[in-house]
């Protein structure tokens, strides 16, 4: 859950997300980075990862793939699936990639909440994000919001949206206009 939460922050809040190979399967989780010049790398965070990539992958569109061999198991790991979903959501919502971040009017109970907006030309992307707890967003635009994670739809008439998102690593991503 901690890794999923970390990835939520990297993909939904900040600029360009970056992870090291192996993060998507928690490769060598808990292993020391280095045991000195005489320690075997196989027992460290710098162990060889290549065996996790053996097999064939054919990809299309964004995050859709067919795979076989060990790489299929790697890509089907729950954390890898979480990362794939975050990539699809981020790709579909311009505000997550380029938007201005704000916490004004974002009240969270037990988690984090923020909003982002991006406008350019005919693009106007507005998103409300809640992680790991309940959140209430006030002073927001009226309209229909769709959660990119669950598909839940909320219609706002009074500039206020409330949502619940219990548990570490969980997020709600309400997009104005539902795109």
Residue spans for each PLM region:
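Short, ordered coil/turn segments that flank beta-strands lining enzyme active or ligand-binding pockets
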Residues: 149-150, 157
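Loop/helix patches that line or flank the sugar-binding groove of alpha-linked glycan CAZymes
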Residues: 1-142, 150-151
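C-terminal beta-strand-rich structural cap/linker in extracellular carbohydrate-active enzymes
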Residues: 156-179
């Amino acid at each position: 859950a901690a890794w999923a939460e970390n990835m939520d922050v990297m993909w939904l809040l900040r600029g360009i997300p970056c992870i090291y190979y192996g993060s998507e399967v928690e490769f060598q989780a808990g292993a020391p980075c280095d045991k000195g010049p005489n320690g075997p790398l196989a027992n460290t965070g710098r162990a060889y990862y290549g065996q996790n990539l053996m097999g064939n992958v054919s990809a299309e569109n964004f995050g859709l793939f067919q795979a076989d061999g060990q790489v299929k198991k790697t890509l089907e790991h729950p954390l890898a699936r979480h990362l794939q979903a975050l990539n699809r959501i981020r790709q579909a919502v311009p505000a997550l990639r380029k938007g201005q971040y704000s916490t004004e009017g974002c009240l969270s109970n037990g988690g984090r909440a923020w909003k982002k907006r991006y406008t350019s030309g005919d693009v106007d992307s507005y998103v409300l994000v809640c992680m790991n707890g309940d959140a209430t967003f006030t002073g927001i635009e009226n309209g229909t919001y769709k959660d990119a994670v669950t598909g839940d739809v909320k219609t706002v008439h009074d500039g206020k949206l409330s949502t619940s998102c219990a548990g570490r690593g969980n997020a709600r991503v309400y997009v104005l206009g539902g795109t």
